[in-house]
Amino acid sequence: TRAARKTGIEIHPGATIGHGLFIDHGHGVVIGETAIVGNNVTLYQGVTLGGTGKQKGKRHPTIEDNVMVGCGAKVLGDITIGANSMIGAGSVVLNDVPPNSTVVGVPGRVVKRDNVRIPSADLVQVHLPDPVMNDIQQLKDTVARLVKHMEE
């Protein structure tokens, strides 16, 4: 449509849109045919509320009231994003999200629910394996063994 060409926002005419939808920096926003968007939802640039191509009938997400979807996030399939939730920028959400949750990552994971952080080993990023340091440590160990062997 002409509006989509001017704004970069594509909303299928079959989508159901609630009151107070706010699309900030809307270029690249896509809302699919069977999507349902609740009241007071905020979408940032590059958001896709799309299908996975595997379903018939209802194949796009339902976004409940007061949800914020960060830039570049993809919410795909016949899933529900619960009220008062936040989807982090760049996330790919393929499963239902409970109300009052924060989701980040690829695939999207709930990291906060009802304002309480969810502990997860997957979320600790300060103890990630470093293959280069592992190789250096192996070399150091080998050198130490060789030096000890030569001293004997």
PLM regions and their residue ranges:
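C-terminal segments of enzyme domains that contribute to small-molecule binding surfaces
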Residues: 58-75, 106-152
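Structural signal for interior beta-strand "rungs" in well-ordered beta-sheet cores
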Residues: 4-111
